[in-house]
Each structure stands twice: as structure tokens, then as C-alpha cells.
Amino acid sequence: GCPRILMRCKQDSDCLAGCVCGPNGFCGSP
């Protein structure tokens, strides 16, 4: 799963493993 840490992102590669970049501009679970 995706670690529950608020991380801003522009693309999935900005996020930790298991996370994707959501439409709100933050990383989250796929």
C-alpha cells in the first residue's frame, strides 16, 4: 500500500512506492 504521508506531487514518480499522484495534487493509494 501507500504510506499515509501527505506528499505533494505532479506525477506518480514524485510519490513513494505504491502511491500514485491524485487529482488533488497529493500522493495517495491507487
Swiss-Prot record:
Main localisation: secreted
Source organism of the structure: Ecballium elaterium
Family: Belongs to the protease inhibitor I7 (squash-type serine protease inhibitor) family.
Keywords: Disulfide bond, Knottin, Protease inhibitor, Secreted, Serine protease inhibitor
Disulfide bonds: C2-C19, C9-C21, C15-C27
GO cellular component, one term: extracellular region
Keyword Magnesium: no
Description of its domains: The presence of a 'disulfide through disulfide knot' structurally defines this protein as a knottin.
Pfam families: Squash (PF00299)
Sites marked Reactive bond: R4, I5
Top-level taxon of origin: Eukaryota
Alphabetized Gene3D superfamilies for the sequence: 4.10.75.20
Locations listed in the record: Secreted
Protein name as annotated: Trypsin inhibitor 2
The keyword Hydrolase appears for this protein: no
Summary of the function given for this chain in its UniProt record: Inhibits trypsin.
UniProt-recorded Gene Ontology molecular function terms: serine-type endopeptidase inhibitor activity
